Amino acid sequence: MAKKAELRRSCTFCRTRKIACSGERICNACRSRSIECVYDLEIAKGRPRLNKTTSTRASISAGPAGPSPITLEDGEPGDGGHSITSAVNPSITPLTGVMAELEVMFRENFGEDPMAAPSNQFQDRVARFNRNLAAGRASQGPSTPAGSLTYPGFLALLMQDLAETVTGKFGDLGCHPFFGPGERFYRACMLQDTTKTMFDTACLPSPSTSTPSGGEADILADYNSHLITQHLEVWMSNHPLSIIISKSLLLRDLRSQTANRVLLAVMLADAHHFADNSAKGDRLLQWAVSQLSNIPAGQEDLTTAQITLLLGWFHVCRGHSRRALCYVGYAGRITTKLASQLHESPLTGQTHINGIDRGAVEAEMIHHMYWVMLALTVWSFIQMDMPLADLLPAQLLQVLPARTTPDSTLLQLDRATDNLSTLKPQLSSLQSVWLLSHVTVLSAHLYALYPQHLRSPPEPQPWQDLMLHRLNRLLRQGRSLTQICSDSRNALLDIIVVLQKESAHGRGEPTLLALYLAVSIHLLFPRDETGHHVHNSQTFVLSDTLFQQLIASIQDLKQLFPAISSVARHDSSQPASTGSAGLHFYLLALDALGRALMYVLTVWDRVTAVEQRVWQDRLRGLLDGGLAMHDLFEYDALLQDHRWRSVKKHLKTACKGIKGVLSGSRDQGSRSSSSSVSSLDLSFALPSRPTPAMGIPTSEEGRSEMMFPTMPSASGIPSSISSSISHTSREVGLSWPGDGQILPTQEQGPRESSHPAASDLSDFDLAPFVSLGSIDSMQNGDERSRIMQQFSPNPMSLPSFWHDPQFSPAHHLVGTMPPPSLISLADLGMGERGQKRSSEKLGGLSEGDTPGTSADGGTKRRMKGMSN
């Protein structure tokens, strides 16, 4: 057994100059000269042993630098030693290297006449999805107009979409999509993108030279080392994935003139785009793409994965969804292989730079890239309704990214080498990838638990095959969707308790708490067992457990709000930060709560009068909780999410409906005169006098009655709750029945009773869905169930499993990159702090009233520049 190599006792600098080395982490000689102190591994002494097998392998790997230009014919798949003729112009020099591999992948996924069958399970499913999409494209109208998306905006969308799509698979509530109304982001962009080729003609090599047609031989010749360094600073400060590249190692390679020029070109192109110099950025990008033909197809290293991932990220935000999918898929294939190798043989124990193990830094970059790829794969497969469990290597899901600077060897190396200028944005990138990994783990496990859709066997079928089909069907049935939702929610509640204890000691993560609370509310209302998007309220049963869990969720959300507000305000300068994501998850939870209250009202209609009397006190507790949640919109923090108007509108509509039910019960004399309000304790953890440091108004304002006239004390409803709510102007938001559907409104007429009539609901876009009577007068759940949002057709199911060892290892995991949309970062709710908020008289909740003032005479807080 070969002895493991050890680090030298003297650093490289002292050894080359033959001076005494102190042997410290940073020796005295290097510290006095302010240079890096590098300790290499000891070289084995004596004559090396000759291994015939190793020698043979070395001779094979030491072949020609590039693949031989053999044109691929008759649908023969390309490999590392072949090339392929471009589909754009057959007269162009045949493509080689990575460029040829990407061309093959594009034809397999999107070619009208595929040159070969898909080479792996991932591409087979992508190709199948694209064929189904193309078949339905002709019958569908245009979805979201094409446009561009900012880099941080797409990262924020990725995290929100993962949470929304997986809850849509299980829950019956629906949600306001973060992306906006219409198709989901991935499907919408795939419908728009009809690109026929993987590469533009300008990127292809010309027949006479190896340079791209119309391109420069070496575009980087215009950049000296100082200019390159400055552009790298810009890139590190602005790219949300800056944590996948080590700044210290890259600058070290740049000084030694060994840096990969293609990677530099891609990063410089992004830097020019950040500086609004698109012309130079596009030229650099074309040159970088053209150089892919010089990278051998079998060179599956970290640098190649970084190049293709960054190219895919650029293309998805520019609207080239097909090309982005191929770039990211190729990067995912390399990254998964590197991560698997890393799991078997760690890279640690190699060269040390200022005391930091270089192998550990490279391993961390691989793990960061792997989680980005896995997130993109899970995100796209959920929207494609394709099974995913067999593509997830179980052992790779056990290592989560670092969260803080002390835990990150990459950032520790930057500190040790005094590369400090971009540490803050790099830390933000690190925390974003950390959060993305947690969202991905939750979504992947829940999606894998989704019951399989049992299809009928094809006819005719031999009796032997029919028997096997029936037996396999029994094997796959597993647990019901209701049981899966219940078990999953119990697991989430256990995690929530742990996080809340950590938060009490200042170590909790409010963003994850907001995510788990949002998902747990959705899991309270499982979808129909058949998997069809039919409202399940006709069979849903009210229970004491349901009310208790909803009340507990309200308490948790109220207690979490100060932390969410503080983190969102602290991280407002970083648009893709965990603070911004936490705010969006919190809005998702509030949206789910408002829909849950409406769901309870829908079920309430069909229960007997005896049951209604039993649950009245619980319903009053939900009313108090809903009003308390509505009060939170007084604070500026929630107004950074573009969905705040719609969520607020749904909350007050739900509270108005509950109030009408309770008022009607009182008028009919069916309500008990008990003075108990509910078993809910709403003594939440918001300070009675918010401090200016929290960004919350410090004036104590009396609260006007919300939506309804003051009830007598016999009702058991508190007449006032400490709050300060700004009024909002009347604006049409997303309607309740179908997110994004804008319905006509009409002026609200005078009330003739305490029941909310259809005219009362006109301001909330609900009038067309409510009969001329009040909400509580509906005799069956069908009328009110029309208010609830429905989802798109039934998704494909997956095998049930929860524990990681049940994931099947796969050798090739290819991630996918989504297409873009017309929205910008501001449209995603990043930094949306503008537009004045007019007052609304909350006593009747009719929008358009005159501005109100606080109890102490101070003018209520307004937001400027808020766009709808």
From Swiss-Prot:
One GO BP annotation of this record: secondary metabolic process
Listed InterPro entries: TF_fung, Zn2-C6_fun-type_DNA-bd_sf, Zn2Cys6_DnaBD
Family annotation (PROSITE patterns): ZN2_CY6_FUNGAL_1 (PS00463), ZN2_CY6_FUNGAL_2 (PS50048)
Source taxon at top rank: Eukaryota
Location of the protein in the cell: Nucleus
Main location: nucleus
Alphabetized UniProt keyword annotations: DNA-binding, Metal-binding, Nucleus, Transcription, Transcription regulation, Zinc
UniProt keyword Cell membrane, yes or no: no
DNA-binding feature ranges: 11-37
Low complexity composition bias: residue spans: 663-683, 715-727
SUPFAM superfamilies, per database record: Zn2/Cys6 DNA-binding domain (SSF57701)
Cellular component terms (Gene Ontology): nucleus
Any matching Pfam family: Zn_clus
Chain intervals for the UniProt region annotation (Disordered): 51-88, 662-683, 715-761, 829-868
MF-aspect GO terms: DNA binding; DNA-binding transcription factor activity, RNA polymerase II-specific; zinc ion binding
Protein purpose: Transcription factor that regulates the expression of the gene cluster that mediates the biosynthesis of pyranonigrins, a family of antioxidative compounds.
Protein name in UniProt: Transcription factor pynR
Biological source species: Aspergillus niger (strain ATCC MYA-4892 / CBS 513.88 / FGSC A1513)
